[in-house]
């Protein structure tokens, strides 16, 4: 689907900054975080651009990506414009030791206007993308639990008899989890603790505690909101007045904090959903194997039945012959 493009990287950047400030001044940080959870591998700028063009976005891909999945873009659909990284070739002159000048092409990372489409703008083969929710997590609990524990690299988890759901010993890198929690309580607690480990492992970005005293807790809750909104879990309730009350210049600086939040969300969600997807595929293979074994058994019985019938007929004829000879 060809579409005339009048946007530039510069105009999209200006639009993204304008929309970002508009959302932040309207107190819509949580809306940005929700989109971030849906698309953790995109930048905050692109989250805002996509959000402004399609507020109810679910899942976006490039045209080639949808074609690969057996889906095509419906007629009269406009692409969602984003800022996309790309490799561009530049010619550069070199002079060798003999003074000869020659030109060599080199590739550099650059930015260009990209185009994506939401799944609602496409049609075709059913797209079995992973829709993680409480039911899926409960069904593949062990895979989910192990994924979260592995994501908190350097930490070990111990399940003990204690009153609080969790206690973290940062000095010895141990997370103590209350033994006997329900599946829902345990998964939420593990997500909370793993998110805290990941937030603490990142270097400071953007606004610091000099400007906002509890910035670490705000980053932590922002990451939890993005992660849990994607997974369909109960969302954290946190106070973001300190961010809403920042100046426009400081809010633009806060985008760097959100990039840190995005990095944490992407790492946890990628590991978590990959683990569950592998578990689902493993179950599908196991189910397929059982079905194939049942079909093979049924086929064997179908072949065996006529042989037994034929053998029984021969035995009956032989018995009659013997009876005749005796008479």
Predicted regions and their residues:
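N-terminal accessory/interface modules of nucleic-acid-binding and processing proteins
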Residues: 1-304, 320-327
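Arg/Lys-rich low-complexity patches in intrinsically disordered regions that function as generic
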Residues: 306-320
């Amino acid at each position: 689907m060809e579409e005339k493009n009048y946007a530039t990287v510069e105009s999209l950047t200006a639009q993204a900054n304008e929309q970002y400030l508009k959302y932040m001044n309207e107190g819509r940080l949580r809306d940005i975080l929700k989109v971030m959870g849906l698309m953790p591998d995109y930048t905050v700028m692109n989250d805002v651009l996509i959000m402004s063009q399609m507020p109810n976005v679910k899942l976006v891909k490039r045209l080639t990506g949808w074609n690969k999945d057996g889906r095509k873009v419906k007629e009269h659909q406009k692409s969602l414009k984003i800022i996309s990284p790309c490799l561009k070739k530049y010619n550069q002159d070199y002079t060798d030791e003999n003074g000869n000048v020659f030109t060599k092409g080199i590739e550099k990372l650059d930015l260009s206007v990209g185009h994506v489409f939401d799944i609602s703008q496409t049609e075709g083969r059913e797209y079995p993308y992973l829709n993680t929710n409480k039911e899926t997590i409960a069904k593949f609990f062990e895979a989910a639990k192990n994924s979260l524990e592995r994501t908190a690299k350097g930490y070990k988890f111990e399940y003990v008899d204690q009153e609080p759901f969790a206690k973290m010993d940062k000095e010895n890198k141990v997370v103590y989890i209350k033994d006997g929690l329900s599946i829902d309580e345990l998964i939420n607690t593990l997500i909370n603790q793993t998110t805290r480990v990941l937030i603490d492992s990142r270097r400071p970005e953007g606004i610091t505690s000099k400007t906002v005293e509890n910035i670490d807790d705000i980053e932590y809750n922002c990451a939890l909101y993005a992660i849990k909104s994607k997974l369909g879990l109960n969302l954290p309730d946190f106070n973001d007045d300190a961010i809403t009350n920042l100046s426009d210049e400081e809010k633009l600086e806060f985008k760097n904090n959100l990039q840190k939040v995005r990095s944490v969300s992407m790492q946890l969600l990628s590991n978590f959903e990959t683990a569950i997807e592998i578990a689902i595929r493993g179950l599908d293979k196991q189910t397929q194997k059982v079905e194939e074994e049942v079909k093979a058994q049924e086929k064997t019985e179908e072949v065996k039945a006529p042989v037994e019938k034929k053998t029984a007929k021969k035995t009956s004829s032989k018995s009659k012959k013997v009876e005749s000879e005796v008479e």
